[in-house]
């Protein structure tokens, strides 16, 4: 089948960063519970779940809305800090730049649909120069209005002007695929 457009997930697909998320959640867990997360918690409670849900888990459901927002933002600040500190692996996956260049050269429309928040998307645009290939306003991110990742993919398809049946999606998360 010929694909006429492409949608990429970002984290875990174009940029390998899971270790930074784990470190950031460890910091939040230490603040809220006085201990780090366990591997079991990571795999059964935290991976692929929204920040707010994780914060409620750490606080036994007792975090106020203000605390949820505060610690969600704090987690992402830690995450960005850990990304910047790891200069060896703070880059797009090998071959991505060349593939993006190829897609641009061939006129194949593409964009990113990520569960990341706007602050992280802005960070990625600036750090990786994503605006060389994709207009920042065409990147779909978690602004709180999408029911699930599939809804984000549909919005991304609208943005690039290609019917979903003609799009190839690169997604690494089972939760992103199952939705």
Where are these regions (language model features)?
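A general structural motif
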Residues: 1-3, 107, 164-166
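N-terminal helical cap/lid subdomain that shapes the substrate entry/recognition surface
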Residues: 3-94, 102, 106
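Active-site flanking residues adjacent to catalytic metal/cofactor-binding acidic residues
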Residues: 8, 170-171
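Alpha-helix N-cap/helix-start and coil->helix boundary motif
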Residues: 21-22, 48, 52, 97, ...
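Hydrophobic packing residues within well-ordered alpha-helices of enzyme cores
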Residues: 25, 55, 96, 121-125, ...
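Substrate-recognition "cap/lid" segment bordering the active-site pocket of phosphatases
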Residues: 89, 111, 117-168, 174-178
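Alpha-helical segments flanking ligand/cofactor-binding loops in enzyme cores
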Residues: 97, 101, 177-178
């Amino acid at each position: 089948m010929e694909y006429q457009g492409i949608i990429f997930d970002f984290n875990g697909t174009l940029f390998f960063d899971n270790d930074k998320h784990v470190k950031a959640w460890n910091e939040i867990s230490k603040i809220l519970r006085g201990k780090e997360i366990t591997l079991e918690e990571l795999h059964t409670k935290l991976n692929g779940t929204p920040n707010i849900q994780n914060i409620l888990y750490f606080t036994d459901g007792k975090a106020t809305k203000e605390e949820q927002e505060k610690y969600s933002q704090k987690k992402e600040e830690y995450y960005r800090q850990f990304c910047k500190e790891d200069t060896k692996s703070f880059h797009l996956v090998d071959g991505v730049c060349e593939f993006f260049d190829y897609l641009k050269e061939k006129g194949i429309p593409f964009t990113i649909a990520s569960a990341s928040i706007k602050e992280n998307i802005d960070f990625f645009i600036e750090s990786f120069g994503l605006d060389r290939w994709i207009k920042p306003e065409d990147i779909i991110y978690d602004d709180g209005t999408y029911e699930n990742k599939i809804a984000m993919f549909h919005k991304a398809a609208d943005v690039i002007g290609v019917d979903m049946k003609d799009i190839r999606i690169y997604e690494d998360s089972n939760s992103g695929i199952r939705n």
